[in-house]
């Protein structure tokens, strides 16, 4: 089986082993599967299954469209993993909660990937809100 791991174009040349999916890929290879990293959306690499792994809180539409070309793609429907998009469990001013809380950033990994890929967050937010980009 051919497994394509779809990555952001800016991940090319970076240490991919920091992503858990590449640790899993070692096991898939040992089981005889071919695992192929695919960077960006300009070159389609045929595969039986794909895993969309874009290290951003908001996945750009072009990556989701590209992922749709694969017969089966894990994470294809996951466009937004910001805390407010995935959880309603938030304490807000006036809630009257006096107990302990866990403080999380709105963005995945405290927005680190967005800072590394400067400008991507602003463009993504603008598109989601129908604004500039």
Locations of regions flagged by a protein language model:
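Active-site nucleotide/adenylate-binding loops and adjacent lid/helix of ATP-dependent enzymes
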Residues: 6, 57, 67-133
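ATP-binding N-terminal substructure of ATP-dependent carboxylate-amine bond-forming enzymes
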Residues: 1-71, 79-82
């Amino acid at each position: 089986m051919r497994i394509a791991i779809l990555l952001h174009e800016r991940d090319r040349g970076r240490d991919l082993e920091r992503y858990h999916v590449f640790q899993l890929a070692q096991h898939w290879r040992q089981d005889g599967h071919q695992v192929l990293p695919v960077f960006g959306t300009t070159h389609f690499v045929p595969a039986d299954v794909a895993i969309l792994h874009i290290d951003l809180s908001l996945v750009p539409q072009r990556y989701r469209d590209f992922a749709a070309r694969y017969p089966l793609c894990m994470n294809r429907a996951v466009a937004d993993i910001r805390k407010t998009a995935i959880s309603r469990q938030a304490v807000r001013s006036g809630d009257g909660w006096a107990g302990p809380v866990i403080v999380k950033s709105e963005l995945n990994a405290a927005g680190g990937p967005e800072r590394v890929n400067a400008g991507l967050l602003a463009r993504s937010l603008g598109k989601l809100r129908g604004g500039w980009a």
